[in-house]
Swiss-Prot record:
One of its GO terms (biological process) is symbiont entry into host cell via permeabilization of host membrane. Keywords: Capsid protein, Outer capsid protein, Viral penetration into host cytoplasm, Viral penetration via permeabilization of host membrane, Virion, Virus entry into host cell. It is found in: Virion. Pfam families: Orbi_VP5. InterPro entries: Capsid_VP5_Orbivir. VP5 protein is one of the two proteins (with VP2) which constitute the virus particle outer capsid. Acts as a membrane permeabilization protein that mediates release of viral particles from endosomal compartments into the cytoplasm. Permeabilization activity is probably negatively regulated by VP2 and is triggered by endosomal degradation of VP2 and exposure to low pH. Belongs to the orbivirus VP5 family. The keyword Transcription does not apply. Residues 1-42 are annotated as: Involved in membrane permeabilization. This is Outer capsid protein VP5. GO terms for molecular function: structural molecule activity.
Amino acid sequence: MGKIIKSLSRFGKKVGNALTSNTAKKIYNTIGKAAERFAESEIGSAAIDGLVQGSVHSIITGESYGESVKQAVLLNVLGAGDEIPDPLSPGERGIQTKIKEIEEEQRNELVRIKYGKEIREKFGEQLEEIYQFMNGEVKGEEEQEEQYKVLCKAVDSYENLLVTENEQMRTLARALQREATERTENESKMVKEYRQKIDALKVAIEVERDGMQEEAIQEIAGMTADVLEAASEEVPLVGSGMATAIATGRAIEGAYKLKKVINALSGIDLSHLRTPKIEPTMVATTLEHRFKEIPDKELAVSVLAKNDAIVANTKEIKHIKEEILPKFKKIMEEEKELEGIDDKKIHPRVMMRFKVPRSQQPQIHIYSAPWDSDDVFFFHCVSHFHANESFFLGFDLGIDVVHFEDLAAHWHALGAAQEAKGRTLNEAYREFLNLSIGSAFTSPMHARRMIRSKTVHPIYLGSMHYDITYETLKTNATEARYDEDLQMHILRGPLHFQRRAILGALKFGVKVLGDKVDVPLFLKNA
């Protein structure tokens, strides 16, 4: 368990300190009065931006340009309408979620229509039975299958999909790690197809990168959903890997509505079992290798990173199958004896016993302080049920403080074994507000508002799913609290833009590109 409290870094912070510090005279003697006046006037009007800010910052504070303004890119390829929402705007997030769900359903249905026969041959006819249970015609009482059996079939089918996808990804990773001469014919074909997709993705990212400004935080956008889907999927489970509708594990699960059936019959929500469409490490690798080919071994690292998400999902479904379903069956039998319920049906009361409170589901939960809400907000990030971990990441943008803490595990019906360590969310929240109250940089009004906020519960603003693994999410949070270079790039612009950038850095990660600039030449022409 860990707790870290740290001051956030912004551009201009050290510059301002340098201009008013006791060492300022030495700095002025070094850079000359002209540069001093130029810097002071620009800082005073808050107009230093882009390369200008980076260069002046470097000269005045004596830092290298490597610690100043560069290009910062979110490690996410965005399709149309995929912009990151403001975490403090539930309406904005809700609309985006609904649009994405509709688009996913359409694409998944296309996969079922196109590859239905091949999918059923590979994964069994029970997939069609599950689909018919959810979408088929209403059958008579005597024809209806026992609901618990359908539930078990859905869980087994989902596990089978994840295990198969895991094997395929490992095969591709092994092929990429081998020398070209040692690959089998099938491995060579897989690598060739994957390389073609990566080349297409690299070209698309290059086009976007060329159009970026040398300032602020950028997003790679402009690819249609179909092109994105085709370019980012490593291996199809059925059919061609170069088609626009690719039969991946995620697409097959959605096409046959496995998670929906499990939720409808048991009340167990598995919507958190996701894999990133495009692995953030893949985008980072592509950005690093701008004018050269990406080595096979680095591609293998990205494939294995995406496979980590599949492995975590496989562990989760095994946890549900081995730990939860036996308990579910036992409670079902008890309810039947007590209430005399029909053998074929699962009583809603049984489902309610396995419901997890919304605030404890494996998602990123967003809260804000009741007062000064625009500046003071925090994320409660919860892991998969089988891992039963969570952490707190709080920001006060008014006084530039970040607070990270590992929290105690929750108890709920789907959780793994409990371990009594760590503090609760409320305890972490109150300490976070105490920081703001006691800080030397806090205004009296802000301190009063934080004291008032401490006496009541924070405002819950909803939640968001994350596609990466919980460990990667935690790594991104670590970078957000430690990496000063990253903080300087995400804490720029209007407040709502800064909050979006923080959420993007948490969900996807940010790559700061270190393009060199000739500082003496820049100053000569300044």
